[in-house]
Amino acid sequence: MSYLGVGVSPGNVSGSTTKMKLIDRKVRVTELILRCLVCVLALVAAILIATDVQVREIFMIQKKAKFTDMKALVLLVVVNGIAAGYSLVQAVRCVVGLMKGRVLFSKPLAWAIFFGDQAVAYLCVAGVAAAAQSAAFAKLGEPELQWMKICNMYGKFCNQVGEGIASALFACIGMVLISCISAFGVFRLYGGSKSRPSSRW
């Protein structure tokens, strides 16, 4: 039996192999597209937030709002920088693999990619969650703690931060999808190990 549960015989071995290669290639192309999207979206998010500055004059005193004033935004910029760099490296790996016609990897490499994708996905989720909570306080305030609505004073700053968080959210969703693909790839390695001990990813 093959690892798809199909009976192996001289008549269907070549057909099933060709079909699996086709599926693998489609998965890798999808992975490449997602990694490129994550790289672009994460980079856009980091740039939008890192370059966001607004100066207001209050009682003859200039007050400047910048992303470093909120630690959650600093975290989001760092996380998106990591996600963009990591996605770029992995996208290059995907391109090289597709150009060489190799879509299968060794188990250690597959596990390394899996753990890397999981780590970056969790970082993205944590960064977006922290930034969204801080943005909510800035937008709505907290009367019980006497926290004022910062966005009433720094509208442009808040709007640009919102755009950055939205871009980071889409990058986060893309990273979660990529981590699912890498998880599928890793666990599929062991699906055929019993019936095809000589095959390697």
Curated annotation (Swiss-Prot):
Keywords: Cell membrane, Membrane, Transmembrane, Transmembrane helix. InterPro entries: CASP/CASPL, CASP_dom. GO terms for cellular component: plasma membrane. The chain crosses the membrane at residues 29-49, 72-92, 109-129, 167-187. It is a multi-pass membrane protein. It is found in: Cell membrane. Residues 1-28, 93-108, 188-201 are cytoplasmic. It comes from the Eukaryota. Residues 50-71, 130-166 are extracellular. Belongs to the Casparian strip membrane proteins (CASP) family. NCBIfam families: A_tha_TIGR01569 (TIGR01569). Homodimer and heterodimers. This is CASP-like protein 2B2. It comes from Arabidopsis thaliana (Mouse-ear cress). The lineage of its organism: Eukaryota, Viridiplantae, Streptophyta, Embryophyta, Tracheophyta.
